Amino acid sequence: MDIRKVYLLILLCTFCILSPVYTQQSLSDEFRKVAGDYAALYTSKVEVGYSPYLYINHPYWDTDEFKKGAVCYGGLVYTDLQLRYDTFKKQLIVITPEKRILLQVDMRKVDYFIIGDKKFVPHNDTFAAILYDSPQMRLTQYVQCKMGTPVEKGRISYRQFEKPARFVLSKDGVDHTV
């Protein structure tokens, strides 16, 4: 009698535990099928955006729209991506293939990225756009985005981002902030 109860308990546990594991595996396989070789990019945090009801502007480089680009991630180049760069959080944002989820790319593994016609390279703790590059010198631009003073508009207080641009001229391995 006790053996039957133990046997039934083992069967019950087997079905209860293995069923969800099998389901998770099929979801993982489906994700890899859709993402393909680009799955490595889609393994980080979901982006928490900026509500237009709270902020009067955005902290993204140039525009808050996604632009076609490429990322050199862990030594591999991934092309035909929709990207935007958040200068406040210093995060590259990528949109998944089905265009439903916005994800932050793990910046520790990013060697460089290209958005539109601008190439971004590491500069201290952020990324800078290359404006001019030659064997003699390089001119880059980066943005030190910070939270500015609140703005009142129609009796409603909004927060705003200040995005002062900084330019760096590099010559003979020495950086000069312009």
Where does each model-flagged region fall?
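Generic detection of intrinsically disordered/low-complexity segments and helix-coil linkers/edges
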Residues: M1, L9, Q25, R32, ...
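Aromatic-patch recognition
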Residues: G69-V178
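Bacterial Sec-dependent N-terminal signal peptides
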Residues: M1-L27
